[in-house]
Regions:
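Conserved alpha/beta-domain cores
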Residues: 249-542
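Non-catalytic, soluble scaffold/interaction modules
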Residues: 1-322, 328-335, 358, 362, ...
Length: 542
């Protein structure tokens, strides 16, 4: 029996033979072209073909997994036609006289590196999307057709990595689970696996060997363990676990409409993290109490030009209206004006406050909270609040309606903000702890580096102590505090977070009901005494 440990990103237990996905790859030839116009038209033809294919995939995804999954491919369509992406390819073909294949390949690497270098995990995961879109264009240019699964029986599908388009195109009746050497929980493939209810493990690295193909295995998407040639006891234990998970899922459906209250009467708000207006449907279906993190990045990713104030306003208005009075917290994007990022190639804003204007205009249509990211000092908060007041004065002068009850908050995602939270709490209405970045910066550990995965541990006492400190400082100053990172859905820490006194946990929509179940099974009177002992215990990296 061989056990390989990765990261579980989609719960469930899959049992069956291992099968290695064989990807048809396009061979990139490089040569100088003389007729650059003809080469450009060749690229444009492949681009058009890719957009049409992605449209078909979006419809397939909508039929199989719903609107949230379809949105992934609609985003890919926009990426394929992105003006900056297209101009970079055109420059290579027209000015550098590259052939189309080389131009697309080099541009893909450039944009993938751009996304991978960003601080936000969601944005980092978009590097894989750029590569996927580019690979589709390259396949058309090179005449390559992707294969499927050459197996007569359902399998545990193993691969170095899987692009979202590969994931959705595969015959789901033949897939018992996904196992990849690379990848992350923020990747679109992981999101698709969760949406489709397929167990998935990522980050197993080079422990996944081709010679294991055909051998019986069990993939536990909850723990991230892949067991090859399991003994009878292990097999029986994991099969029993699968039956229990299926029973639990049926139970969870009965929790819709029930309160998030512990056995000793403490209430916690369970909100959702979303990335676009289309995700609101998933919040409603899973009975989320509100939106604790709405990433405004989608407006920039899904547009080839800088989004206008009206475009931003309409998007925010749609979400607030659809949530029908439930709280919506929108995180601002911290680029523009004098903080230009060269590789985005964004024009200098004539009105750097237009994003804030859009937010306050939208506030008239629901219960809005505005959240500023990556804050480390009181000065930054005061400057942000000053901008908010200026925007409100302008709107009032122009006779444009807005709400006076907009809460202003900040993300606590750096050690500096956590340590300084006693002072920051005096300036805002709420804190939202971004545990992904807080863990990374506290432990000085790149969470995207698989080799360091053992040391990127959100359960580290230093991280938990900072969360406890932030919670205490928030409550001392009369403001509420929540978590909007992946850790909020970690059921192993639900009891700890409730004992700390966190007021809100914001998670992916599919995590709402499992988290509600965990909350209702918790008695914080029993766990509070144990909390400090656990934080004081000797630590060993997992």
């Amino acid at each position: 029996m061989i056990t390989i440990q990765g990261k579980g990103v989609s719960a469930g237990v899959g049992v069956g033979p291992l099968y290695y996905y064989r990807r048809a790859t396009a061979e990139i030839k490089r040569y100088t072209v003389e007729d650059t116009d003809a080469e450009w038209h060749r690229f444009k033809g492949a681009q058009t073909g890719a957009v049409e294919q992605l449209g078909q995939l979006a419809e397939q995804a909508r039929a199989e997994a719903g609107d949230e999954a379809a949105m992934l491919f609609e985003t890919h369509q926009m990426m394929a036609e992105d003006l900056d992406y297209e101009e970079a390819i055109e420059d290579r073909i027209t000015n550098q006289k590259m052939n189309a294949e080389a131009a697309v390949s080099d541009t893909a690497e450039q944009f993938a590196e751009m996304f991978a270098s960003m601080d936000d995990a969601y944005m980092q995961a978009r590097a894989a999307d750029v590569k996927d879109v580019s690979q589709r264009i390259l396949s058309i240019l090179c005449g390559v057709v992707q294969g499927g699964i050459a197996s007569d029986v359902p399998v545990l599908l193993a691969a170095d990595d899987l692009a979202p388009s590969e994931t959705i195109q595969l015959d789901k009746s033949k897939i018992l689970g996904f196992i990849t050497a690379g990848g992350s929980g923020s990747s679109h493939t992981a999101i698709l696996a969760r949406t489709m209810g397929i167990p998935a493990i990522v980050g197993v690295g080079d422990a996944l060997k081709p010679e294991y193909e055909g051998r019986q295995a069990i993939a536990d998407g909850s723990t991230g363990a892949l067991v090859i040639d399991p003994d009878d006891d292990t097999r029986d234990r994991l099969l029993k676990k699968r039956e229990e998970q299926q029973r639990l899922q049926r139970l969870l459906e009965t929790l819709k409409g029930q309160p998030n209250v512990t056995k000793d009467g403490k209430t916690v708000r369970i909100y959702c993290n979303i990335g676009s207006p289309e995700d609101v449907h998933a919040v409603q279906v899973n009975d989320g109490g509100g939106i604790g993190l709405f990433r405004s990045e989608f407006l920039y990713l899904n547009s080839s030009t800088f989004p206008t104030e009206d475009e931003q306003f309409e998007a925010y208005k749609q979400v607030l209206s659809d949530m029908d009075g439930k709280e919506v917290i929108i995180r601002t994007l911290d680029i523009g004006a004098d903080k230009q990022i060269g590789y985005f190639d964004l024009p200098k804003e004539d009105n750097p406050a237009m994003g804030m204007r859009a937010l306050f205009r939208a506030s008239a249509y629901g219960k809005l909270g505005i959240m500023f990211p990556m804050v480390t000092s009181v000065w930054e908060v005061r400057e942000a609040k000053k901008l908010c007041e200026e925007v409100k004065r302008d709107l009032k002068h122009e006779g444009i309606p807005y709400s006076e009850d907009v809460q202003i908050g900040i993300m606590i995602e750096t050690p500096a903000a956590a340590i300084n939270s006693d002072r920051l709490a005096k300036e805002v209405d709420f804190f939202s702890i971004g545990t992904n970045d807080l863990t990374q910066y506290t432990l000085a550990c790149d969470r995207q580096n698989n080799d360091l995965g053992r040391f990127y541990d959100p359960h580290h006492p230093a991280v938990l102590r900072l969360i406890k400190l932030v919670t205490e400082n928030a409550h001392k100053n009369g403001i509420w505090v929540g978590i909007c990172g992946e850790l909020g859905a970690d059921l192993a820490l639900t009891e700890t977070f409730l004992a700390m006194g966190l007021d809100e946990l914001s998670v992916t929509p599919r995590a709402v009901l499992p988290l509600r179940n965990a909350v209702r099974m918790t008695d914080t009177r029993e766990s509070a005494e144990r909390l400090m002992a656990e934080l004081d215990a000797d630590y060993t990296a997992r």
